[in-house]
Amino acid sequence: MIEKSQACHDSLLDSVGQTPMVQLHQLFPKHEVFAKLEYMNPGGSMKDRPAKYIIEHGIKHGLITENTHLIESTSGNLGIALAMIAKIKGLKLTCVVDPKISPTNLKIIKSYGANVEMVEEPDAHGGYLMTRIAKVQELLATIDDAYWINQYANELNWQSHYHGAGTEIVETIKQPIDYFVAPVSTTGSIMGMSRKIKEVHPNAQIVAVDAKGSVIFGDKPINRELPGIGASRVPEILNRSEINQVIHVDDYQSALGCRKLIDYEGIFAGGSTGSIIAAIEQLITSIEEGATIVTILPDRGDRYLDLVYSDTWLEKMKSRQGVKSE
């Protein structure tokens, strides 16, 4: 038998977590901004954490067996994470998606062998979330031994981030954390990580980054193009009282944020990361220099080549926001 070093894992799933952190010196020279590179998880996003945590919890407690058919509504990243883990564990999976899913994400999910159900009709808020949920309910009623991941209401979602990235952040950052800035959709990541951070840094301010047109914090619903941030419903796992500030960012600002990050730091990240960069740029205009800001970069940029990294898409979003060309 070959003796393995500590760096050699038994399974790809063992490489989920322990993502690196980097300081964004060039982009934010007057503040200490630390970014956790969640896109370096094996499935390419922070969604590997809840996918692994929820499935392994279900298996441990007998809720998921070899005959179980996993069902989930997803804009892409959780679908990829679930598809990866389902393939490794030999489970069946159906992902309910909508037309806003990036073409790359859709191809990856299908490459893992997952079933895909595409909804076409938007819901009353102009998004597709409620339509996707209705399709999930239909599948649950017709598929034997179906198990709904239900990321918007599943307490295991935020717990995965509490025990995962949240714990890793407080173990890495030894100085007081002034601000924790995170994007919201299911709100699992901001709820879980902030709860762990507040245990160690009780004075940390929790800043949620939401999409303009998302209804999570009561904004008026409008059409949104960028997947993976915002929602057309309020997640059950959200506790608004734990959020100190909300910054809304539009699709155009998010795309500019992505491009600034790659220009200044060489980091090629996804659309919600651009939202974070734009939000931090707003935040630092109202705080003292030298603040310690911690954030997360949720997913990889190569999944958004047809969106935030497309000049055609950028011009479309620019026109929609009424930004005048120079």
Swiss-Prot record:
Q: Where does pyridoxal 5'-phosphate bind?
A: 77, 185-189, 272
Query: Per the similarity annotation, which family is this?
Result: Belongs to the cysteine synthase/cystathionine beta-synthase family. SbnA subfamily.
Which PANTHER family would you find in this protein's record? CYSTATHIONINE BETA-SYNTHASE (PTHR10314)
Please report the organism this UniProt entry assigns to the protein: Staphylococcus aureus (strain Newman)
- Which Gene Ontology terms cover its molecular function? transferase activity, transferring alkyl or aryl (other than methyl) groups
The organism's superkingdom is given as Bacteria
Q: How does it assemble?
A: Homodimer.
Query: Which residues does the record list as N6-(pyridoxal phosphate)lysine (modified residue)?
Result: 47
Q: Cross-referenced CDD domains, in alphabetical order?
A: CBS_like
Q: What induces it?
A: Up-regulated under iron-deficient growth conditions. Repressed by Fur under iron-rich growth conditions.
The name this protein goes by in its record: N-(2-amino-2-carboxyethyl)-L-glutamate synthase
